[in-house]
Amino acid sequence: MTVFFLPRRATHFAWLGCFLGLLTLARADQVTLFPSADATLIELKPTNSLGGATWLAAGLTQNGNTNRALMKFDIAAAVSAGSTIVDIGVRVSVTRTPVDGNADSLFSLRRVLRPWNEGSNLPADSQYPGLGAPAQLGDATWTHASWGTNAWTIPGGQEDVDYAAGFSASTGIGGIADYFFEGAGLITDVQLWLDHPAQNFGWMLKTEEEKSIFTARRFGSRELEDAGESPQLIITYLPPVVITNVHIASNRLHLTVDALLGYSYAVESRATAAGTNAWTTLTNFGLIFSPGPRTATDPLTNSARFYRARRN
């Protein structure tokens, strides 16, 4: 009898890939990521870009012009497919406020719904660095997600088309300091992006009070030499659930899962590794109130059978 579990993307399942072998014990892990790309959208100069600057701008300036910032993180490169996201924090650092006065406001992170490119432009005018420089092909601008090829639905992006209608998280932002976003919405976003990397277009950072002047802020970008002021995504996750022990006893196959408190576990089987055949529940351990190993058993047969462990 051959037993296989193979890695599978976009699920919270782990498939065992061994012949009566041992796999790694599931545990909670944490990783901190810096952006893989970030950029500023500049209403006053809608065809300019600023992807190479050491800051991001968001909010309404004293002159009534809006800036919005974009940032994305390569989650799939840092977290194993099939992991369960349990907590998310996003940290941003305000590095500058308006010179002539400032107003505190609620800032939000909204999931971006279409691809965009960072670009590498630096300010063209040192006297007005926030205006960026004429966009190069592919740069994110106020009018384009990718200059010359992919326009926003409306300049600055349209809610519910270019970016989510509701925010994933929000926090009040005032003076020069570090600020944190957290909450269930961010967990949902990151889980989605881990399970479906092609949908990971990151977040838009914007004030929710775009009619209030002096809410503009500069935030550290990924280009800063001091990464301590760059945006950070802190991910706490459970690696894919695995079957930690497989052995034969009393003419039965025994498959053990290390179960964590507060999650439901099951072991399932079917006759083929791929395809659309339904999985049959071998043992449903239900919600775990006392953590520790749980073992499912299955009679030995002459036919191949495939098993997976599932955590909800």
Task: Describe the residue ranges of each PLM region.
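Flexible, small-residue-rich N-terminal segments that precede or flank a structured functional core
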Residues: 28-79, 160, 164, 209-213, ...
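A short beta-strand element within beta-rich, extracytoplasmic domains
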Residues: 73, 84-97, 233
